[in-house]
């Protein structure tokens, strides 16, 4: 058996470097920035054009490493709309290949279990941008998405998008220039960004002179390891929470962790609710419940904080943000986990979250979530949240995990992914601890696989996090791998 690596030291190093390229570049955001030009038509960010040139797939599409249809659709629409502004032969050839892909694959997304964020806003917007550029796109095949767009915008009070923060900030590039300008007046952050979104920030530059927004994008460009632009920036609180949780769950206490725990306590003590970044004005249930769960596992009394989660309670589930079109399995599982520190007091809320999660179960065994493409991510968080309070929901999950493990010890797409394998191990450990699994042989097989991938570089991780396009959060993948290896060691 491979000897266990120094996982505590690796966790300490990870926590000390969280501010280094927290998320990968992706096509969607890079395309919006590639389209920015000066008055002479010269691109403001030529490195973004180069990134698009070198990240088109052989079939003409753009998007993540794994062929997730909705990601390929939105990413390809964004790329061809942006590149259609340029006359270079390579750009024209790339656009034509992208258009051909869209005609050949415009229906693929309908059978996919995934949708990207703001999908119902992005597709109509990008189709319109392509039409204005003279591209021959299969727009008539997406009329039902236009109806979803109308329905989503109809749920928003007329005054809300400009007078108070809303989730539209994150996708502000998809709203009218007039609404974007009103949002910028109130919600553009001191660092120049809006909505933690490079694409939305690029829209501020596109629709008018905004030196602060351009300076923000230039700072991102200077830090980019490959010339592309990330899905989210800044996103420091989200990254901190999701990096800490597996480490704390595994019982690791690396050097420096107390400082990070204090950061979460300070946020909750000050506001009661948590956002994904100090620059983002809208708190959410996911980051809030995550912070509470981490602190509870680390020994903090979170009882005074828990009532704040009731802000997100609805008739039949808990929402992450107001005005969402649908709920999230992982968010409801996380809220149930947070409330499980006071299971008697919050029994109705745990039951409500469990009921929603039960309705989303697939084949009686596993789940998908809107924020991540892997069923192992969603299923792991259900196991974390409900194995101790609602074990009946998970009675067949261990069998599903056993049956879907690959011969090489991994789980997941394309014959196995380190991130998916780590979440499968974390899920199985939770089931074992709850008495819902007894066969630990999958854990020993996974251990060798994860050891082999412990030192993978950032570009070797597939994009599985779900934004308007898919992206990778390498620190979170490594945190899950380190923690899974630490827990698996106990079963060797």
Model-found features: residue ranges?
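Nucleic acid-processing catalytic cores of prokaryotic defense/repair systems
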Residues: 58-62
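Short, small/polar-rich motifs associated with maturation and membrane association
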Residues: 55-56, 108
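Buried hydrophobic core positions in alpha-solenoid tandem helical repeats
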Residues: 11-15, 52, 98, 102, ...
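Repeat-mediated protein-protein interaction surfaces in helical alpha-solenoids
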Residues: 10-17, 173-188, 225, 363
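An alpha-helical repeat/solenoid feature that recognizes helix-turn-helix modules
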Residues: 1-2, 20-47, 64-96, 108-140, ...
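Terminal amphipathic helices with adjacent charged low-complexity linkers/tails
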Residues: 221-227
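Outer-membrane beta-barrel channel domains
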Residues: 261, 265-269, 273-277
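Helix-turn-helix repeat elements of alpha-solenoid scaffolds
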Residues: 4-9, 176-178, 267, 309-312
């Amino acid at each position: 058996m491979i000897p266990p690596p120094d996982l505590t030291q690796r966790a300490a190093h990870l926590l000390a470097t969280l501010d280094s390229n927290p998320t990968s570049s992706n096509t969607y955001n890079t395309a919006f920035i590639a389209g920015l030009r000066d008055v002479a038509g010269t691109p403001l960010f030529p490195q973004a054009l180069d990134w698009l040139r070198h990240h088109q797939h052989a079939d003409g599409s753009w998007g993540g490493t794994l062929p997730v249809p909705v990601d390929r659709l939105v990413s390809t629409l964004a790329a061809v709309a942006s590149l259609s502004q340029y006359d270079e032969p390579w750009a024209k050839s790339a656009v034509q290949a992208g258009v051909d892909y869209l005609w050949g694959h415009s229906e693929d997304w309908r059978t996919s279990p995934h949708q990207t964020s703001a999908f119902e806003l992005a597709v109509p917007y990008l189709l319109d941008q392509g039409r204005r550029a003279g591209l021959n796109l299969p727009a008539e095949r997406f009329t039902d998405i236009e109806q979803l767009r109308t329905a989503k915008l109809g749920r928003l009070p007329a005054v809300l998008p400009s007078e108070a923060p809303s989730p539209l900030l994150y996708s502000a590039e998809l709203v009218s220039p007039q609404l974007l300008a009103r949002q910028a007046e109130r919600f553009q952050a001191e660092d120049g960004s809006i909505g933690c979104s490079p694409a939305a920030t690029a829209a501020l530059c596109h629709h008018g002179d905004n030196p602060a927004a351009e300076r923000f994008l230039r700072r991102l460009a200077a830090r980019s390891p490959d010339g592309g632009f990330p899905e989210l920036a800044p996103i420091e609180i989200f990254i901190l929470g999701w990096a800490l949780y597996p480490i704390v769950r595994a019982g690791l206490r690396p050097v420096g962790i107390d400082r990070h725990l204090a950061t979460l306590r300070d946020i909750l003590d000050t506001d009661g609710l948590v956002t994904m970044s100090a620059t983002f004005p809208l708190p959410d249930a996911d980051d809030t419940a995550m912070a509470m769960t981490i602190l509870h596992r680390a020994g903090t009394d979170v009882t005074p904080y828990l009532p704040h989660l009731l802000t997100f309670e609805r008739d039949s589930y808990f929402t992450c943000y107001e005005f969402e079109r649908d709920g999230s399995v992982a968010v409801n599982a996380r809220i149930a986990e947070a409330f499980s520190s006071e299971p008697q007091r919050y029994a109705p809320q745990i039951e409500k979250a469990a009921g929603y999660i039960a309705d989303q179960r697939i084949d009686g065994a596993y789940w998908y979530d809107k924020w991540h493409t892997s069923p192992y991510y969603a299923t792991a968080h259900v196991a974390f949240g409900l194995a101790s309070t609602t074990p009946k929901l998970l009675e067949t999950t261990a069998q599903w995990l056993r049956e879907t493990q690959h011969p090489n010890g991994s789980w997941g797409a394309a014959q196995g992914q380190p991130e998916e394998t780590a979440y499968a191990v974390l899920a199985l450990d939770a089931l074992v601890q709850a008495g819902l699994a007894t066969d630990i042989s999958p854990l020993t097989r996974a251990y060798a696989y994860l050891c082999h991938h412990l030192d993978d570089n950032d570009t070797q991780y597939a994009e599985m996090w779900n934004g308007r396009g898919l992206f990778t959060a390498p620190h979170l993948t490594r945190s899950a791998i380190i923690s899974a290896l630490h827990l698996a060691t106990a079963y060797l």
